[in-house]
Amino acid sequence: MSLIEFPLLDQTSSNSVISTTPNDLSNWSRLSSLWPLLYGTSCCFIEFASLIGSRFDFDRYGLVPRSSPRQADLILTAGTVTMKMAPSLVRLYEQMPEPKYVIAMGACTITGGMFSTDSYSTVRGVDKLIPVDVYLPGCPPKPEAVIDALTKLRKKISREIVEDRIRSQNKNRCFTTSHKLYVRRSTHTGTYEQELLYQSPSTLDISSENFYKSKSIVPSYKLVN
């Protein structure tokens, strides 16, 4: 039985027999029924939106976009992923039923892009959060490249073995030590001026009386010049 195309039946015989395995049958049934969860945060997602039109017509691949992770088996991440949205992305991935797949679309999703050099809040690769099946580089990738990534994912599904998929999910994932989520007290207290006026004496180098006294001695025009 062909893993991607339909099996060629014997046209000369009325009693054709198709032999396959449950694993191959399961893979074949999922090739043209991928339901993606679209997770776009930047300009790369605009290129994916053009696939909905009649020029590329991504419906021919059986893609049905879903807004709920519980009904999707493919999540397509496009754009920058920040540390603040990282827990939400992981939660969406965990809510997806098995088997599930991930396509990382664009340089910002794969490596952090131009924000990965000096940004303190950008995740340098979505594969640090969730396992990625297909990497789609580009800034942004063209719609033809997205179709090619979907084709490669379908080929991967056709050769998939259930035992290997379960074994790969049980492995421990490593995270970079420079990107960790710390729980901190909120700094938005609304008492910014009060904190400056009512500092403890131990934190001040000079007393408030000497400060205002020295400030009144220096003329304002000397401070400007």
From Swiss-Prot:
GO biological process terms, semicolon-separated: aerobic respiration; electron transport coupled proton transport; photosynthesis, light reaction
Q: Where in the cell is it found?
A: Plastid, Chloroplast thylakoid membrane
Entry's cofactor comment? Binds 1 [4Fe-4S] cluster.
Q: Cross-referenced InterPro entries, in alphabetical order?
A: NADH_UbQ_OxRdtase-like_20kDa, NADH_UQ_OxRdtase_20Kd_su
**GO CC annotation:** chloroplast thylakoid membrane; respiratory chain complex I
Q: NCBIfam families under this entry?
A: nuoB_fam (TIGR01957), PRK06411.1 (NF005012)
Query: Signal peptide: which range, if any?
Result: none
Query: Which enzyme class, named as a word?
Result: translocase
Q: Which residues bind [4Fe-4S] cluster?
A: C43, C44, C108, C139
Recorded family membership: Belongs to the complex I 20 kDa subunit family.
Q: How does it sit in the membrane?
A: Peripheral membrane protein
Keyword check for Plastid, yes or no.
Answer: yes
Q: Which cofactors does this protein require?
A: [4Fe-4S] cluster
Gene3D superfamilies per record? 3.40.50.12280
Q: What is this protein called?
A: NAD(P)H-quinone oxidoreductase subunit K, chloroplastic
Catalyzes what? a plastoquinone + NADH + (n+1) H(+)(in) = a plastoquinol + NAD(+) + n H(+)(out); a plastoquinone + NADPH + (n+1) H(+)(in) = a plastoquinol + NADP(+) + n H(+)(out)
Q: Which residue spans traverse the membrane?
A: none
* Domain of life of the source: Eukaryota
